[in-house]
Structures are given as structure tokens and as C-alpha cells.
């Protein structure tokens, strides 16, 4: 079962980790009785993009060739280093005398009709599926639940996938009336294959002209010259490129594999003392490979696959033979130790009063170790070997310099946290309940300044059962409950310190001295980010809860919000960011949920539920001069009195009646009004708010059909109110392949 806890009362128990809410996952347990077998299956279908989609308005090959011809007829001067394909490529070849006029005409006709479907070639409709098989049973002394699962998720980009095997064992044991134990063990093995970050298939499919062939008429891959980087002996710094060749000769593989126990003691009636411990260990291996036939390796080789690299400094060769293999191996170990006491007391003539006290301490630890390495000269298709013992190493001085450097890096991280928490609760019959929750956290990752001020997390909450008190005799109302809560949460960033943090480096062979660099600036004045939250709600149930509704409202105020500010280069590190308490953020919202069971028979049941919510926020902050114009255009600037994520655009004045081009208000005739204005004041005067990136309203519809032991679920989620900028009509022609 998955529960989402958002109010202050629920999140107070989870401390600083719960600043944005809590997701609680409860695994299944065994029940007394003979063995019961279960099977659960879920599926997901994802549709790939298509050129016929409304939001994909791209030229076909004939339109793109015509567009290139119009540019040429207008004597548009193409950049000399532009990738020449399509009409521009055919025309350039003709002008250079590399083809006749008839060949030029035939090439243009071919480009007009090729109409490459890049979305079909590079992406796919996907079907993902999840299977879980379980068995449970037991007697009064021992109960068990064992499950095994398999999950396969294919990515929209072809050749990408995630595959996972899982196993779970839950044992509940009763040794006596006062000694009980729960043991749980789980594990998973997963394998992933993603495209290299340099190969963005979706972006390539959207931004590449359909007049660019993917295959030659004989079915072989079509290559075109694409720009590279660095010094090169190739004309205009270009090497052959085919995205299918890059995908076929590269891989980004991830292999990972990832136990818990709890002892519960009940010494006296009404008092539970539980001690639990949990240990997890995960081991991951990531391998990134670039083959020697790829454009990526050609840039480092400074030559094509079949070419011998030019020797000497002029050759600028960083990889004479083979490909590149990058490996990262990491091990993460974590543990949790918890001691908890639960006490319940019933008193009164009819035991109508109930008092409950729960308290405990929790200790968490996490250790991570990793090693990364890069090796060149790797040949995957010849027995996973490396090319070594190069006799002519001096012919490639750049590669020799690279070999003399250390390309192995190690990482080691340790974190410890100790927490204490309590819950104090009182209830009278089933009429009303009052709760007081609290928690504190201390960690080696909070920074020493934050621990100087003790800021616990606490909340108070209550609920009143109106149905029992006021509408007890109204039969069609089965539940009517009013609830409310108020709480305070604190948050501190892990990597901030009042002291300057220096990263110690290795020996510099030039100066024969150990070197160091600035890792974090001192931040002695950073304060806790504090959130006060007030929640209220009303729950109504009709006809024995066949129909139920819930109304919720909340008001959340976060003070001393963390914000990143650019630090001037005079501080020693250009472009570095500094964390400050940048102001306050007010969030107000509501939610409405409805659930119903329209059909319920002995074997069949249909449940329907819907949820709708709205959120309205406003920033209260002073102007920060370190924002740039792009921050206002992208919506990353915080502006006083404006919702977070709001972005601005130049004021549109309409179309120019003489030539049809768009007109914008540039304040050219009122420049004097902008004198001595800050950037924020200038933006607010000359631009207009276009919207905000985050949705204002969101909701979902859910249907669940159950027939005997089979169930089928369908969910639809939506969001309203967010805005994004439109895609550009076309990419800059300078790229050549757009």
C-alpha cells in the first residue's frame, strides 16, 4: 500500500526529510491459514511522437528543399563551415564543380522525395509490464509472505530499456504472549541500457531535416560530414556522421543489485516495546563505451576509422587506435536502528477515554564508496581487449600526454543522523481526537551552524466526528468528520558550513607542491528554512461509505527560503553560486476528492474516484541584483509578489503593416524612462508576464474493476495552468541539418 502524507501532523514524525511531504510504502504480510497464491500484473503503453501530432509542426522534405532554394535565390550567404546536406549540399557540390548540372537536379529530386521519418527510425511505441507472484499463509506461531517479481520498461528511444527482478520475504513470528518478531528480506537485480548523453535521439528526430537521408538507395547507412572540435587536419573540422552508427557502436549499460529485521516485545498489557534494525547494501556498475567507428572517437583520433592518424604535433591525435571505455563502480551501505515505545490506556466507567503515548529514537547511517576510470584503445569486438605496447608512442604526443595523467577518481561519503520523536494522543469514544507530534534531527550533514539552534519539528491536530454527535440518526450519512492541524517544519541544506571548505588536491608536478581549491564558501549567516502549515478538512460518507467526499484547504508559509545567487568572480571562483535566505513563500490551496462504488455484487465491484486541487503561491522577497535577463525570460528569477516560476516576454505590438514582420516594444523612444533603473525594474516596465511554469490546478480520474480475484485499474491524470514557450518554427539554418 502507498500512502501520501502532506499535512503538518503527518510529516512531523519524519523530520527534516519531510519538508515536501512523505510517501509511505507498506509491504504485504502473511495471514493465518493455508497457502494462498496471488498474481498481480500492470501494464503501461507509451506512444512515440509522430509528424502528424498537433504539437509537431515540421516541414516535410519537399518543403525543406523549397525553403533552401528560396534562401539561395535571395543570395543568403551560408556559413563556410556549415554542414552541407539537402538542397544546400547539392548546390554547394555543383558550385565547386564536384557534380554536373544533371547530377545536381537528380540530387534535388531525391532530397525532395526522401522524406525521412526520423521519429519512426529512432523512437518506438513502448509496452511496459510488471508481474508479481506471491504466496502467503501460516499458523498462530509463524506467518509468511514470499513474492517474486519481474519488471520490463522499454524506453521511447530505441535500444533503451530497464529490466528488474525483485524478491521479498516477510516472516511474522510469535514466540509467546510477550515476545513477537518480524523479519523481512528483500532484494533486486536490475539492468539498464540508455543512450549516451551525447546522443539525444528525441532531440535529433525533432530538429533534423526530413530532406536528410538515413539510408543510401542500396540500403547502406548514409553519412554526412559533421563538425567536430579542437585542432584538426580535416577540412573545416568535420568527420562522417550517422546517428544510427553512433547508436550501434556505443553503449551505456548499468548493472545493479541491492536485508531488515525487527524484534517486538510486549512486557505488560498496553505497553509495546519494539526494537528494529535494517541494513541495505547496493552495488552498481556502469560501463560507457564508444566504438572506434563512431564520430565521437573520430574527433579524438583526428581521423576516420580506416585512416592512420597523422603523427606529430600537427596531427593532434588523442587516441590513435581503438575506442573509449569509461567505468564507474559504486557501493552504498545504509543502516537504521530504531527503539520505540507504545503505551495505550483506557479508563472511565465504560472505558470511553483513551490515552496513547508513542516515543522513540532512530539512528541512521549511510556510507558510499565509488571508483571511476577511463581507458582508451579499447576494442570490444575482439575479445574485450585493450591495444597496448604501441611502439611509436612518440608519434602521438597528445596521446602520450593523456597517458601520463591519472584518469582514475575515488569518492567516499559518510552521513550519520540521530532523531527522536513522540506522539501524544487523546480520544473520547469515537467523538473527537487530539494529537501532539514532535521530532528533532541532528546530523553531521546539516552544517555546524544549523546545529547551534535547536529547531524541532512539531504539530498539533484534531478531529471531530460530527456524525456521532449531531447526525447520529441520519441513516444515509455514514460519516461526517471535521479535522484540522497546525505544524512547523524546519529544513537545512546538507552541504553548507560557517567555515570555508577547502578541497585538497594532489601533488602538482610543475610546482612540486600540493594544491587545493575552494569547494564551499563560508556561510555563517545561513538560517533554517522554516515552514508553518495550517490544514483543515471535512470528510463526508453516504450510504455506508458507498459514496464519500473530502474537502481540504491549507495555508503554508515558508520563511527564509533558500535561493542560489551568483557570486562575482572577484571571490576567486567565476560563476560560482552562493546560498542565501532569500525571502518568504506563501502557498495556499485546496483539494476536492470524490470516491464511489456504483456497482457492488458478490463477485464484481466497480470503484470510481476523482481528485481535483488548486495551488496558488506568491513570493515575498527583496530584489536580487545577481539575476540575469535570461533568469526573467526562463522563470528562474524570484520577484516580490509574483508566483514562483513566472516568466516574462517582450511586449508584442502586432505585425508590421509594410512587410508582415512582428513588432515589439523596445522602448527606443523612451530610453530616458529606464535610466538608473535596476534590471528587475526595467524588466517589469518593458516586458509582460506570460505565465508560470508550474500548474495551478491538477487532478485525476481512477477506475478499479474487481471480479473475484482479478482486478483492473485505469488512471488519468491532468494539470492545468502551466505555460511553456512554443517550439521555434525552425532551428538556425547555420546547423545545416535542421
State what each model feature region is.
Residues 48, 53, 62, 66, ...:
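A subset of solvent-exposed loop/turn segments in beta-rich extracellular surface proteins, enriched
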Residues 106, 296-300, 304-310, 719-738:
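Extracytoplasmic gating/loop element in the C-terminal half of outer-membrane beta-barrel translocons
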Residues 40-109, 364, 371-379, 583, ...:
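Conserved small-residue
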Residues 1-168, 173-176, 180-182, 186, ...:
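Short, small/polar-rich motifs associated with maturation and membrane association
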Residues 67-106, 299-314, 383-405:
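Charged, glycine/proline-rich intrinsically disordered loops and linkers
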Residues 192-208, 619-627:
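Low-complexity intrinsically disordered tracts that form flexible linkers/tails across taxa
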Residues 90-136, 143-147, 219-266, 399-423, ...:
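Outer-membrane beta-barrel transmembrane strand signature
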Residues 164, 170-179, 185-189, 234-290, ...:
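Extracellular/periplasmic, surface-exposed regions of secreted and cell-surface proteins
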Amino acid at each position: 500500500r502507498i500512502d501520501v502524507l502532506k499535512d503538518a501532523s503527518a510529516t512531523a514524525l519524519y523530520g527534516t526529510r519531510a519538508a515536501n511531504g512523505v510517501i509511505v510504502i507498506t509491504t504485504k504480510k502473511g495471514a493465518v491459514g493455508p497457502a494462498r497464491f496471488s498474481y498481480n500484473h500492470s501494464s503501461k503503453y507509451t506512444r512515440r511522437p509522430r509528424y502528424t501530432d498537433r504539437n509537431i509542426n515540421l516541414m516535410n522534405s519537399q518543403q525543406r528543399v523549397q525553403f533552401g532554394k528560396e534562401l539561395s535565390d535571395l543570395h543568403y550567404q551560408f556559413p563556410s563551415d556549415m554542414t552541407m546536406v539537402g538542397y544546400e549540399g547539392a548546390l554547394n557540390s555543383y558550385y565547386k564543380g564536384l557534380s554536373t548540372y544533371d547530377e545536381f537536379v537528380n540530387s534535388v529530386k531525391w532530397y525532395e522525395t526522401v522524406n525521412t521519418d526520423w521519429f519512426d527510425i529512432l523512437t518506438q511505441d513502448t509496452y511496459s509490464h510488471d508481474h508479481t507472484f506471491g504466496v502467503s499463509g501460516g499458523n498462530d506461531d509463524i506467518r509468511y509472505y514470499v513474492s517474486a517479481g519481474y519488471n520490463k520498461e522499454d524506453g521511447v528511444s530505441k535500444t533503451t530499456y530497464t529490466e528488474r527482478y525483485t524478491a521479498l520475504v516477510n516472516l511474522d513470528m510469535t514466540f509467546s504472549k510477550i515476545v513477537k518478531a518480524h523479519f523481512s528480506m528483500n532484494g533486486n537485480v536490475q539492468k539498464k541500457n540508455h543512450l549516451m548523453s551525447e546522443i539525444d535521439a528525441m532531440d535529433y528526430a525533432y530538429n533534423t531535416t526530413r530532406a536528410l537521408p538515413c539510408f543510401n538507395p542500396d540500403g547502406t547507412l548514409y553519412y554526412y560530414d559533421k563538425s567536430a572540435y579542437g585542432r584538426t587536419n580535416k577540412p573545416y573540422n568535420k568527420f562522417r556522421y550517422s546517428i544510427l552508427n553512433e547508436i550501434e557502436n556505443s553503449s551505456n549499460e548499468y548493472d545493479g543489485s541491492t536485508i531488515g529485521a525487527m524484534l517486538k516485545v510486549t512486557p505488560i498489557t498496553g505497553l509495546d516495546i519494539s526494537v528494529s534494525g535494517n541494513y541495505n547494501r547496493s552495488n552498481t556498475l556502469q560501463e560507457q563505451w564508444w566504438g572506434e567507428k563512431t564520430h565521437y572517437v573520430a574527433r579524438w583520433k583526428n581521423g576516420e576509422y580506416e585512416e592512420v592518424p597523422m603523427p606529430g604535433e600537427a596531427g593532434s591525435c588523442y587516441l590513435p587506435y581503438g575506442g573509449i571505455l569509461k567505468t564507474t563502480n559504486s557501493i552504498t551501505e545504509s543502516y537504521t536502528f530504531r527503539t520505540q515505545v507504545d503505551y495505550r490506556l483506557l479508563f472511565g466507567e465504560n472505558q470511553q477515554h483513551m490515552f496513547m503515548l508513542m516515543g522513540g529514537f532512530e539512528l541512521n547511517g549511510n556510507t558510499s564508496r565509488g571508483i571511476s576510470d577511463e581507458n582508451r584503445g579499447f576494442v570490444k569486438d575482439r575479445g574485450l581487449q585493450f591495444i597496448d605496447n604501441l611502439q611509436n608512442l612518440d608519434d602521438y604526443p597528445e596521446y602520450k600526454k593523456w597517458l601520463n595523467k591519472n584518469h582514475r577518481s575515488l569518492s567516499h561519503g559518510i552521513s550519520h543522523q540521530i532523531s527522536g520523536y513522540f506522539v501524544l494522543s487523546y480520544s473520547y469514544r469515537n467523538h473527537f481526537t487530539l494529537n501532539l507530534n514532535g521530532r528533532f534531527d541532528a546530523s553531521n550533514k546539516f552544517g555546524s551552524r544549523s546545529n547551534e539552534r535547536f529547531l524541532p519539528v512539531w504539530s498539533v491536530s484534531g478531529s471531530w466526528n460530527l456524525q456521532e454527535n449531531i447526525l447520529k440518526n441520519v441513516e444515509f450519512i455514514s460519516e461526517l468528520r471535521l479535522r484540522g492541524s497546525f505544524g512547523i517544519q524546519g529544513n537545512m541544506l546538507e552541504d553548507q558550513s560557517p567555515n570555508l571548505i577547502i578541497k585538497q588536491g594532489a601533488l602538482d608536478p610543475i610546482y612540486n607542491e600540493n594544491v587545493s581549491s575552494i569547494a564551499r564558501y563560508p556561510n555563517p549567516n545561513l538560517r533554517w528554512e522554516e515552514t508553518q502549515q495550517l490544514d483543515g478538512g471535512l470528510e463526508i460518507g453516504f450510504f455506508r461509505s458507498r459514496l464519500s467526499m473530502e474537502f481540504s484547504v491549507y495555508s503554508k508559509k515558508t520563511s527564509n527560503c533558500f535561493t542560489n545567487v551568483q557570486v562575482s568572480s572577484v571571490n576567486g571562483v567565476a560563476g560560482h553560486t552562493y546560498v542565501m535566505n532569500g525571502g518568504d513563500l506563501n502557498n495556499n490551496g485546496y483539494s476536492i476528492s470524490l470516491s464511489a462504488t456504483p456497482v457492488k455484487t458478490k463477485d464484481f465491484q466497480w470503484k470510481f474516484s476523482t481528485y481535483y486541487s488548486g495551488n496558488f503561491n506568491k513570493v515575498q522577497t527583496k530584489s536580487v541584483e545577481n539575476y540575469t535577463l535570461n533568469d526573467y525570460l526562463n522563470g528562474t528569477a524570484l520577484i516580490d509578489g509574483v508566483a514562483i516560476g513566472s516568466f516574462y516576454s517582450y511586449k508584442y505590438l502586432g505585425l508590421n503593416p509594410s512587410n508582415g514582420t512582428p513588432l515589439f516594444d523596445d522602448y527606443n523612444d523612451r530610453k530616458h524612462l529606464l535610466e538608473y533603473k535596476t534590471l528587475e525594474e526595467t524588466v517589469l516596465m518593458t516586458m509582460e508576464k506570460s505565465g508560470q511554469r508550474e500548474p495551478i490546478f491538477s487532478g485525476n480520474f481512477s477506475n478499479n474493476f474487481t471480479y473475484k480475484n482479478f482486478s483492473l485499474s485505469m488512471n488519468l491524470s491532468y494539470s492545468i495552468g502551466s505555460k511553456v514557450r512554443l517550439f521555434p518554427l525552425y532551428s538556425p539554418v547555420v546547423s545545416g541539418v535542421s
